[in-house]
Amino acid sequence: MASSPILRTSDSPSLIPTTLEPESLPTYPWESSGKGKISPITKEYFRCRGSDLNPPIPILKDGKVVENIFDCHGADSHSLPIRHEKEFIYPILIELVNEIHSATGKPVIITSGHRCPSHNRYVDAEAKNQASKHQVGAEVTFYVAGLEHNPEVVLNSIFAFYGSTPRYASEGIEYTQFERYDKETDVSTKPWMNKEILIKLYMPHEGRNADNRHPFPYLSIQVRFDRETNMRVAYSPTDAQHFLRR
């Protein structure tokens, strides 16, 4: 289906700061499944977290409100990204959060999976965020309940996964070894990356937005390379708009 593009002004007007209020997180199936039982995390938990109950964010220019940014109507109003006529999240993201859940035995709390372009802009209207991979199902942010202040445990489970999984071991150090990303980013800790993914650690004073209102450090995983298509993964405006409207 066709939709109107999201427009931005070229002179980058400023945003009026808003106060983000803490909100309760959704209940996941494993939270009531009983001790020792692990329910798989599916793409359902990656759905857009927009809501028409969120207040508009006014944009100022020369002291005047020139625009209000509205959130989307939420996951009930649109699908996940569509690929090959099916709802799509990059499989490695689903595999990794399940691996973390299994390795730690603790709930993985996904705070932001897919973001439609409207919700992505509502979360962060800065120009640099408009190419976020959240919009194409290639990024997820999360923390692990019970390990909120021990993200290194979660990181180590990811590193161990790549080091012990045969399909990566057979392809060499491009996948099994992580290096640090030295370019400027929005985090104070240098990200980790291999050929397939890039991992960021957001400290409690970083990355707070409408999807991450909690006080904990959290991790972001971006997909860099699609092993299925053998192609680099990048944001595409066309792909970002390729979802079903309800």
Annotated model-derived regions:
Residues 89, 110-113, 143-145:
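Short His-Asn-centered micro-motif
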Residues 84-88, 114-121, 190-199:
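Short linear motifs at secondary-structure transitions and domain/linker junctions
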Residues 129-139, 143-246:
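Catalytic cores and adjacent binding grooves of peptidoglycan-active enzymes
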Residues 44-105:
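Active-site acidic/histidine clusters and adjacent loop/turn architecture
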Residues 11-22, 88, 98-101, 108:
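An N-terminal domain-start capping segment
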Residues 93, 124-127:
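Short acidic (Asp/Glu) patches
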Residues 98-125:
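Extended, low-complexity, intrinsically disordered C-terminal regulatory tails
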Residues 1-45, 225-246:
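N-terminal secretory targeting signals
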